[in-house]
Amino acid sequence: MRVLLSTAGSRGDVEPLVALAVRLQGLGVEARMCASPASAERLAEVGVPHVPVGLQLEGMLLQEGMPPPSPEEERRLAAKAIDMQFDEVPAAAEGCAAVVAAGELAAAAAVRSVAEMLGIPYFYAAYSPNYLPSPHHAPPEDERTTPGVTDNKVLWDERGQRFAKRYGDTLNSRRASVGLPPVEDVFGYGYSERPWLATDPILAPLPPDFDAVQTGTWILPDERPLSAELEAFLAAGSPPVYLGFGSASGPGIDDAARVAIEAIRAHGRRIVLLSGWADLVRPDDGADCFSVDEVNLQVLFSRAAAAIHHGSAGTEHLATLAGIPQIVIPRHTDQPYYAERVADLGIGVALEGPVPTFDAMSAAVATALAPETRARATAVAGTIRTDGAAVAARLLLDAVSREKSAVLA
């Protein structure tokens, strides 16, 4: 059996699908993945065939002083993202028994259109509950809304309308070119009628009354060793504080890192700094700060005193599973949700962004380093499920089996 996995997004969108792909391969399924060109090295490491599809996101990030894209540029990029899926995914999906998509929803809607054209089942996986439309929470804080509107249902309706306006014409034009009818609710079409929620039920529970399948988080055990230089740094002193913002970028991120380093040093702690997509650099040549470009977070977190990060789903699940206290400085999308969950669970501190004050950061570091916070983080870590990818793999195989039985009947 052959299955296609597809995502348009950052490393955080790719890694859960890597876990699912490896699990499927262990069950004898041939899993291949459509992902950005930047994913080539990672997929080669785990032996998952890679079909390069999508934009090179790292080169499109907003840096300090850069204006946001104009509406015309947004529409151009939206059309290009959808066109690339229609151009490349059909060949990759040929002969596949099912398609699983995750990440950017417009690309997923195009991928579902390809699955519809080929007559194969489609599944969408979300990495955060706040991506799922619900009257119990507002949409992610990454879109303009009508001033003064607070009703969650209205906010979700507005989001769907903006989505259709931005992507609908391109999507339906490409659908018409392959004989498919137009889609009015582009937003809902991408999500599917019953999406999967690839999150841990303790850390990120399913919203009440929402028809979705929660599988648990998809994490691939990472056995890559730390570099000899990092091992030497860790051995030379007490456990450091990890500081990194992953694929986050934009105005204020350099200042946030600077304030965090000052606060960590004020508490007499060392730092491991992840450069990330923002290309963060050490502020000086101090021996108490070690910089890394790529690192096994599963191993590093197990040896760190605390983690200061942006709160994306992937980093959040890894830090929670490791049982280390966290300080979350959220910026957008799922990050405010996970920051709030860290505070609610008592496993760390959620700070207001994008640049906390030194006093706020210093107080957060004190809380994170407190023994009671570590004890609570350790307790919560013991409740986190690690079988989410296995659950999803079995769900997928069962669904394909039912589909085949229905066809034969």
UniProtKB/Swiss-Prot annotation:
Catalytic activity reported: dTDP-beta-L-vancosamine + devancoaminyl-vancomycin = epivancomycin + dTDP + H(+); chloroorienticin B + dTDP-beta-L-vancosamine = chloroeremomycin + dTDP + H(+)
Cited Pfam families: EryCIII-like_C (PF06722), Glyco_transf_28 (PF03033)
Annotated keywords: Antibiotic biosynthesis, Glycosyltransferase, Transferase
Enzyme class at the top of the EC tree: transferase
Pathway listed: Antibiotic biosynthesis; vancomycin biosynthesis
GO molecular function: hexosyltransferase activity; UDP-glycosyltransferase activity
Keyword Ubl conjugation: no
Origin superkingdom: Bacteria
E.C. designation(s): 2.4.1.-
GO biological process terms held by the UniProt record: carbohydrate metabolic process; lipid glycosylation; vancomycin biosynthetic process
InterPro entries named among the record's database cross-references: EryCIII-like_C, Glycosyltransferase_28, GlycoTrans_28_N, UDP_glucos_trans
Function recorded in the entry: Catalyzes the attachment of dTDP-L-4-epi-vancosamine to chloroorienticin B to form chloroeremomycin in the biosynthesis of glycopeptide antibiotic chloroeremomycin, a member of the vancomycin group of antibiotics. Also able to use dTDP-L-4-epi-vancosamine and devancoaminyl-vancomycin (DVV) to create epivancomycin. Acts downstream of GtfA.
Protein family per UniProt: Belongs to the glycosyltransferase 28 family.
Miscellaneous section: In A.orientalis different glycosyltransferases are involved in biosynthesis of the vancomycin group of antibiotics. GtfA (AC P96558), GtfB (AC P96559) and GtfC are involved in biosynthesis of antibiotic chloroeremomycin, while GtfD (AC Q9AFC7) and GtfE (AC G4V4R9) are involved in biosynthesis of vancomycin.
Name of the protein this chain belongs to: Glycosyltransferase GtfC
Protein encoded by which gene: gtfC
